[in-house]
Amino acid sequence: MKKLLVAVLILISAALFAGTVSVIGPWSGVEMDAFIPVLEAFKAETGIDYTYQTYRAEDLANVLPAQFSAKKSPADVIFMWSSFITSNTKSIVELTEVIDTDAYIPGALDNVTAADGAVYGIAYTAKVKPGFWYRKSFFEAHGLTAPSSWDEFVALLEKIKATPGIKNAIASGNGVGWPLSDVTEHFLIAFGGPELQKDLIEGNTSWTSYAVRNAIGKLVYLIERGYFSEPTEWTTILEQWWNGEYGLYFMGQWITGMVDDSDDLAVFSLPGSRGMVFSIDYAFVPEFAANKTEALELVKFLSGEKGQSIQVSQGGHIATVEVYVSNYPPVDKEIAKLTEGVETVNDLDDSIGGLWQTAFWDQLKLLWVRPERLDDVLMDLEQKMPE
């Protein structure tokens, strides 16, 4: 009788939430394939069906304002830039009392929180820029270990530099000036704290301040001593690093899908760093959603431990709420451990954007080959900051 009663209650619960929720997200191909299991699990738990379509954020930025003006929405749950969410709160459902905001890691919801503290979006999973990657086999072959202090880091670079066949200790990937920018941000966060990165983004700290010069000065110290290679196209030098021409390579989490054997990968952050750049996927529920009740159930699921556990188990994602480390594939477990106790920080040049971003990239390319020009570089960056 009890089993029958439980079964009936489950059926009633499913019936209460019967319906369909439409979702717009940025993922296609294999990335979409990794997201669908999350939606399937949501469907199995709630009885709510779903539809999913891929839409670029750049295109949504043109479509959504007109839709909202007509009190319409192309979907019930939409993944979109955080800046769009906070700029359109009149057309977006407040989620402060819908999701468990306390479950998030520090800083994860900052970008979708209004000045009055109201939360208008969820922080789904993220990709992070954790630090310096190395091949376990390379470290084992040469008796190397990850550092736990700045002095140990410098000593490690010296050992790698002295290894036969090594060109430089650290491979300097480059394109338009990225990923040199990611390396620089890592030093700003490690030696100036997450607060320095946030203050620079908000324009509350000068690029010529002691805090900035001290942090980037640490980077310049390493460049001057030849530990970093000359900037080289980032996928080309990635292959060279993998083949043993360099010992370390700073890159985001997506590197795990770009090498032949991700099980041979390991990573460490600069010792003592209290923050890490997270590239978080944000989502919101429009006020004009056709299936608002179902949409709110989905965002609760996506912002919870169960939904995010399923996503991270697919690989290439880090949860923004606490999940068991056992849910991660092997290489992502190491990244997840590095994120414990650290604060999420926005990408610096992406946040400031505009002409300043290209100036930042250009100045870093200069800094890598002319490190003695540090003061000129910082002055130029300060002068070009948007007002």
What positions do the PLM features span?
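Conserved N-terminal structural module of periplasmic/extracytoplasmic solute-binding proteins
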Residues: A18-I85, T101, A146, Q253, ...
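Extracytoplasmic/periplasmic substrate-binding proteins
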Residues: P26, G217-N291
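Conserved C-terminal helix/tail region of periplasmic/extracytoplasmic solute-binding proteins
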Residues: A44, D49, E140, E224, ...
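Hinge/lid segment of periplasmic solute-binding proteins
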Residues: W81-P130, V267, K333
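Mature extracytoplasmic/periplasmic domains
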Residues: I92, G257, D281-L355
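Short, solvent-exposed loop/beta-turn-alpha elements that line the ligand-binding surface or hinge
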Residues: E94-N111, I170, N174, F191-N214, ...
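Extracytoplasmic/periplasmic solute-binding protein
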Residues: Y120-Y124, P130, V154-E202
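Glycine-centered hinge/linker elements that transmit conformational signals in sensory
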Residues: L157-E158, I201-P231
